[in-house]
């Protein structure tokens, strides 16, 4: 009798995706992040579901309902802290996953890459609307500031903002619809993840060398299932250490105060994973210019495949491009730091220089380095 996993219509799909999938024999731990992101998504959906059972999306009771979850619901504190810090783990894995894609040239699988960028945008949108739900000071003012950016759009801006708010300010209607968005978006993410995997399995995985690995493939199970479980154990350990020992380390103290439209916090800033984009937004004195730079900082990922000039796919054997890649990494860390600082000197100028360097590295220096490295492979002298 033939094995059921190879004949049953549903099992066959799972078999070709996770068991008998031919995988390159040399992929490193940097290829673990896809599965880790899948686990993050499952954790977020499950903890979120249990939170939604006790949460009320009304301005008068939202803050109290979150306090009630933490105080009175069985293990509510754990579910809430896992959900909040799970988001941080999600973005940590996302940034490393994208960084891996840039370093090893995985972006040349264009469909997979583009779906991945869309996924990044949807996850960012989900995190933003989710941050508003506890209805603390930073939730309220974060929602006010970020939604207000849309008013920079010429002609329709103000109408658009009031349409999203459901009134003339962030209020009950805004909170209710943000809860609805926060509930539906993760399921849209699941659908996009399936499409992401579908396109990936059309081509097979890339590998560190950037060379076609078809001549040497091994089955995904047991080799990479075991390897993924190791990465998973590290991630779960990190998440539990964060959740159980310092659950509020990455949060903002202002969010322990209920939302008050009459009192603005001294420094309005988003969660750490948005700070790099927030720094780019703030570094441009013009409102519309800032919004466009903010969008460009993420959407620039879509044109990275078009900026690939090298004859080699990966950065593994390209020391000049490697140096620029790590400069870009340092640059993003600098932007993240600046995004959390008040708007005063010397932070303003550092932010402006870092923002300019970010675009300069991606748009000009890295493609130029690729061309130079091509020349160095076969110098004309």
Swiss-Prot record:
A biological-process GO annotation: mitochondrial electron transport, ubiquinol to cytochrome c
Binding locations of heme b b562: 83, 182
Cofactor: heme b
TM helices/strands, residue ranges: 33-53, 77-98, 113-133, 178-198, 226-246, 288-308, 320-340, 347-367
GO CC terms: mitochondrial inner membrane; respiratory chain complex III
SUPFAM superfamilies per record: a domain/subunit of cytochrome bc1 complex (Ubiquinol-cytochrome c reductase), Transmembrane di-heme cytochromes
Binding site for heme b b566: 97, 196
Topology within the bilayer: Multi-pass membrane protein
Gene Ontology MF: a single term: ubiquinol-cytochrome-c reductase activity
UniProt binding sites for a ubiquinone: 201
A Pfam family: Cytochrome_B
Keywords: Electron transport, Heme, Iron, Membrane, Metal-binding, Mitochondrion, Mitochondrion inner membrane, Respiratory chain, Transmembrane, Transmembrane helix, Transport, Ubiquinone
Cofactor note: Binds 2 heme b groups non-covalently.
InterPro entries on file: Cyt_b/b6_C, Cyt_b/b6_C_sf, Cyt_b/b6_N, Cytb/b6-like_sf, Cytochrome_b, Cytochrome_b_C_euk/bac, Cytochrome_b_N_euk/bac, Di-haem_cyt_TM
Cell compartments where the protein resides: Mitochondrion inner membrane
Function, as annotated: Component of the ubiquinol-cytochrome c reductase complex (complex III or cytochrome b-c1 complex) that is part of the mitochondrial respiratory chain. The b-c1 complex mediates electron transfer from ubiquinol to cytochrome c. Contributes to the generation of a proton gradient across the mitochondrial membrane that is then used for ATP synthesis.
SUBUNIT field: The cytochrome bc1 complex contains 11 subunits: 3 respiratory subunits (MT-CYB, CYC1 and UQCRFS1), 2 core proteins (UQCRC1 and UQCRC2) and 6 low-molecular weight proteins (UQCRH/QCR6, UQCRB/QCR7, UQCRQ/QCR8, UQCR10/QCR9, UQCR11/QCR10 and a cleavage product of UQCRFS1). This cytochrome bc1 complex then forms a dimer.
Note: Heme 1 (or BL or b562) is low-potential and absorbs at about 562 nm, and heme 2 (or BH or b566) is high-potential and absorbs at about 566 nm.
Family annotation (PANTHER family): CYTOCHROME B
Family: Belongs to the cytochrome b family.
UniProt name for this protein: Cytochrome b
